[in-house]
A protein has these predicted regions:
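Non-heme di-metal
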Residues: 1-152
Length: 152
């Protein structure tokens, strides 16, 4: 059976979008509850957000959305490129046309950030492809991300 183009593929994409949006909302809601002193409610929002994350991962995997690190970097760079070259540019223009100048500027600002994200992912992808991730041409200090041990 071919998933591509099927109703099931469309449903997987909808489920993934719904779960990722719910996760983000619940993270935000948890922050508000915590600031207002509702620790238990914050914890429940956070636990539910973590559940939604796992649901989203299941649907994303079913869509074939998780590959090797190189594939993931290329995919991430392409997504960031779309966001800054198309999506946010269009959204800024439309917001401007409708008189939402502050939102238009925010769209533009985020677009500039997305461009930096794309550049960062492309640089990392180049390092992976050229096998330079763990090698540097100059003397470098490396820090263990777990315990903090330093090596020169």
């Amino acid at each position: 059976m071919e998933l591509k183009g099927s109703k099931t593929e469309r449903n997987l994409r909808e489920a993934f979008a719904g779960e990722t949006q719910a996760r983000s909302k619940y993270d935000y809601f948890a922050s508000v509850a915590k600031k207002e002193g509702y620790e238990q409610i914050a914890a429940i929002f956070q636990a539910t957000a973590n559940n939604e994350k796992e649901h989203a991962k299941m649907w994303f995997k079913a869509l074939g959305g998780i590959g090797t690190t190189a594939e993931n970097l290329a995919s991430a760079a392409a997504g960031e490129n779309y966001e800054w070259t198309d999506m946010y540019d269009r959204m800024a223009q439309e917001a401007e046309e409708e008189g939402f100048t502050e939102l238009a500027e925010k769209f533009r600002q985020v677009g500039r950030i997305e461009k930096a994200h794309e550049e960062r992912y492309r640089a990392l992808l180049s390092n992976v492809e050229m096998q330079r991730v763990f090698e540097k041409s100059e003397e470098t200090m490396w820090e263990c991300r777990n315990c903090g041990h330093l090596v020169i």
